[in-house]
Amino acid sequence: MGLKARRAAGAAGGGGGEGGGGGGGAANPAGGDSAVAGDEERKVGLAPGDVEQVTLALGAGADKDGTLLLEGGGREEGQRRTPQGIGLLAKTPLSRPVKRNNAKYRRIQTLIYDALERPRGWALLYHALVFLIVLGCLILAVLTTFKEYETVSGDWLLLLETFAIFIFGAEFALRIWAAGCCCRYKGWRGRLKFARKPLCMLDIFVLIASVPVVAVGNQGNVLATSLRSLRFLQILRMLRMDRRGGTWKLLGSAICAHSKELITAWYIGFLTLILSSFLVYLVEKDVPEMDAQGEEMKEEFETYADALWWGLITLATIGYGDKTPKTWEGRLIAATFSLIGVSFFALPAGILGSGLALKVQEQHRQKHFEKRRKPAAELIQAAWRYYATNPNRLDLVATWRFYESVVSFPFFRKEQLEAAASQKLGLLDRVRLSNPRGSNTKGKLFTPLNVDAIEESPSKEPKPVGLNNKERFRTAFRMKAYAFWQSSEDAGTGDPMAEDRGYGNDFLIEDMIPTLKAAIRAVRILQFRLYKKKFKETLRPYDVKDVIEQYSAGHLDMLSRIKYLQTRIDMIFTPGPPSTPKHKKSQKGSAFTYPSQQSPRNEPYVARAATSETEDQSMMGKFVKVERQVHDMGKKLDFLVDMHMQHMERLQVHVTEYYPTKGASSPAEGEKKEDNRYSDLKTIICNYSETGPPDPPYSFHQVPIDRVGPYGFFAHDPVKLTRGGPSSTKAQANLPSSGSTYAERPTVLPILTLLDSCVSYHSQTELQGPYSDHISPRQRRSITRDSDTPLSLMSVNHEELERSPSGFSISQDRDDYVFGPSGGSSWMREKRYLAEGETDTDTDPFTPSGSMPMSSTGDGISDSIWTPSNKPT
């Protein structure tokens, strides 16, 4: 353990040897010179007297994450480092060092300035004393005007004025000196700026006027008598009682707040004064005044100015009585205008009175609100520090730097472990040997002590072996911090000796830096909650008016929220305004004319990109859209179920129906089939060849689609189905021969969707061929149900089939149909089937979505015009 301590000491010394005895910790001068040559930074060690405490400084690692490390408190060669003042942003040091007595000096200066300029508490007693002195001087100056009290009052006035001059002079000097606590009054220029204030100029004028009066005294010469009149200038000292001009500010604010009302009252009063004075002057100007003997004297209203004087005294309710109207006309005019003018002349007094009362109340409330500033500022500061001490925010280091600069810990110097465990060191043993040659490549390094170079104190008794908990805790904290510092500094240099530096694991009890951060975090949380509680206490209402205002504000906020909620509800459940874009208007020459009741949203020939912009974005519109989609899905499912039912019915048909002996059935069986209304409908069925080669594995790609006719599934049927009429003969002629038979899977599926067209334009006898049966009720219900679906086979072209995502759509060209009243083709030629790879629902324009155009669904066209096509699919 001692070897590791000596190695750490040698590394800290910058090349010191590992020798034992008294020179184990001494630095090598040569090694120190070589290290100093490549390093220009300062070296930090421990100065005498700083051995008991160290400050927590910013980590020296490259990450600069605010790690708390130990740093010595002094310079090299025992020089104490002078703390530099840091600017507000903790970036630029102040140029002047801060003196030790500056804090006390500034505190006294601020205290005097507040007592003189902003008196509170005990300072009010001094200002009350000054007021009594000024009032006494004023009373004695008044008594000197009496002949009987002139001598006595003059003597007392001289003594009191002399005392007042000294008091006011000292106060003025203290004001000039204490003004330096304010930033704008610093220095001699700031003092001159403070002396140029109006109240300071008034103090200077009163002092200058009082000095000659006191110097002359009570002499009876002419000079003394003339100077005594300056004593009444002391009346101006009453103005200095309000140093901050609060009364004048209050009056000015009241006048400014009610300026419009005051101007209105004064304007109407002035008009009343002019009009009443002029009318009284016209009536009374030629009436002479009579004395007691009845002799005529000059007129009382000789000029218009006399009338204005009378009007002002009368309307102001003073009424000296020196001028009065003599005639009844003048008295009537004076009475009429007095009733009007007096009210307007007295109105400004009421306005100012109410305004002053409101301002005083507002000032009291403002003082109450000012009490919230400090708790609010403390809460903001505590909230920020609580946020900044979050361990997950590694980018916030300012708060940790603050704690690094203010938090300090007791320091126990590092020594040989044997000596630390065997005895308690004295004061001299805790003094670090200065090491002027010690250096390190990083410059800023901790230099541990070595007790081998210090003589052991003989006054200390040996202690039992072992460290107590307090020493172990402090030693572990210092050793861990030093080891982390060393590792962070030597990480970039790649020093091979870095692994040997540090201390034994026996003393590394725990990592103190995270523990310290956690403790600071806990303190910040407690302070945040405390300041939050204090701030809530200051939010209590000041008076009933505050309570009413709070309720009013809450009521307005509630109304605004209710209005916002109502707006949201209206937007959710109210459909949007109808929109009619330009591209949805009917064009001339178009194939179809859309009805007016049809929604543009359901127009089949409008692209999705166009309809999405005009869709109703309200919740009700979305509900309607979902409901329509569910309805469309139901129709599609009905269509698929119908297809499946047809397929299953086709497989259940008896095979013997297709042989010639089928017609030789018994009459009883024929009648039974006629009566059976639930027999399956005769459908188109593909027949597999029995004479051909064995069926190969089926694949959709084995049989090209161009080789299969529209009715190719009858190519291998040995039976030629015949029907009555010329159309059946023509249909049989068009059927391909069964000479070349080959095994293939049927490529078409029957559909009952279009059977309604067959029923409409064929008679019952035409539908019932030699191999046909009655239509079952279930099929009839399927026909009735599917006839309402907006599925159309006339509008799907092959381009739509190619871009269909599923490849399963109803395929039939609209050009293949021949519209006419007589479509005498056989029902065998009608293409009531689905081709493989086709569907009716994949293309966007023909997806069932509500009401479709009549031209698209065929509702407005007669059933007799539907004629199938002969073209292959």
From Swiss-Prot:
One of its GO terms (biological process) is sensory perception of sound. GO terms for molecular function: calmodulin binding; potassium channel activity; voltage-gated monoatomic cation channel activity; voltage-gated monoatomic ion channel activity; voltage-gated potassium channel activity. Residues 357-538 are annotated as: Mediates interaction with calmodulin. It is a multi-pass membrane protein. Residues 145-154, 215-226, 284-303, 317-327 are extracellular. Residues 588-601, 725-741, 844-873 have a biased composition (Polar residues). Residues 1-121, 177-194, 246-257, 355-873 are cytoplasmic. It comes from the Eukaryota. Pore-forming subunit of the voltage-gated potassium (Kv) M-channel which is responsible for the M-current, a key controller of neuronal excitability. M-channel is composed of pore-forming subunits KCNQ2 and KCNQ3 assembled as heterotetramers. The native M-current has a slowly activating and deactivating potassium conductance which plays a critical role in determining the subthreshold electrical excitability of neurons as well as the responsiveness to synaptic inputs. This is Potassium voltage-gated channel subfamily KQT member 3. It comes from Mus musculus (Mouse). The gene is Kcnq3.
